[in-house]
Amino acid sequence: LLDTDFSIEATAATTTAGSGSKVAEASTSDYRVAVFGAGGVGKSSITQRFVKGTFNENYVPTIEDTYRQVISCNQKNVCTLQITDTTGSHQFPAMQRLSISKGNAFILIYSVTNKQSFAELVPIIEMMKEVKGNAIAETPIMLVGNKKDEESKREVSSNSGQKVATNMECGFIETSAKNNENITELFQQLLALEKKRQLALTMDDPDGKNGKKKGCHIM
């Protein structure tokens, strides 16, 4: 589906917010992805599982962390996937707005075991509409229900998540950072939604079959 395939190199650089990185300096461009969601839904776990391949059982609240994954193109172009793991607290709205204004794409995460975390995405969505304006229509967005491994504790059905994603006209997937389920697929589908650049991860799904290349509209 995509003419240009990108592959992830074996090494990735991780930085905290505000710090520099040799990876960033070597890149011709950054593709900035901001990850939003309530505290404890697994934002850091999903990001670290994707970038580092690791999972930490202990919950450590995040103010803001930035992870950079080097992506190389078949045509030898260099692109850096910059993933910002944002705070789950409502105490830092200015930081959230800044992440939205700079972001090229967004991942909205809730826990399938917590209805409240599902509801807490609403103010983030409203802020995205306010900050991005009409540009939100062409912005790739994935709605993610994490912790699908805890099925016995589920409070949000898959159908509920899919209905919201359908209304938003964006991507939807359920993941388990703990079991490394659908983590790579999440980022594959996110990049497949990008219209302005042809981006793809040449891993399990080189043709981007799991993602539909379309814009995301928030009503």
Swiss-Prot record:
Lipid attachment site numbers (S-geranylgeranyl cysteine): 216
Can you quote a single GO CC term? plasma membrane
Q: What is its main location?
A: membrane
Kindly list the cysteine pairs connected by disulfide bridges.
none
What superkingdom does the record give?
A: Eukaryota
**Residue ranges the record assigns to the propeptide:** 217-219
Output this protein's name: GTP-binding protein drn-1
Q: Under the GO molecular function aspect, what terms does this record hold?
A: GDP binding; GTP binding; GTPase activity
- Species name: Caenorhabditis elegans
Q: List-wise, which residues carry Cysteine methyl ester?
A: 216
User: What membrane topology is given?
Assistant: Lipid-anchor
Stated family: Belongs to the small GTPase superfamily. Di-Ras family.
Q: What happens when the gene is disrupted?
A: Viable and fertile. Resistant to paralysis induced by treatment with acetylcholinesterase inhibitor aldicarb (but not with acetylcholine agonist levamisole). Hypersensitivity to aldicarb treatment is partially reduced in an egl-30(js126), goa-1(n1134) or gsa-1(ce94) mutant background.
> Gene encoding this chain?
drn-1
Name the InterPro entries for this protein.
P-loop_NTPase (IPR027417), Small_GTP-bd (IPR005225), Small_GTPase (IPR001806), Small_GTPase_Ras-type (IPR020849)
Tissue expression = Expressed specifically in neurons including the nerve ring, ventral and dorsal nerve cord motor neurons and tail ganglia.
Q: What is the effect of changing residue 40 to V?
A: Probably constitutively active. Does not reduce paralysis induced by aldicarb treatment
So what does this one do?
Displays low GTPase activity and exists predominantly in the GTP-bound form. Together with epac-1, may regulate acetylcholine release at the neuromuscular junctions probably downstream of G-protein gsa-1 and adenylate cyclase acy-1.
**Binding residue positions for GTP:** 37-44, 56-62, 85-89, 146-149, 177-178
Question: What processes does the entry annotate via GO biological process terms?
Answer: signal transduction
Q: Name one Pfam family in it.
A: Ras
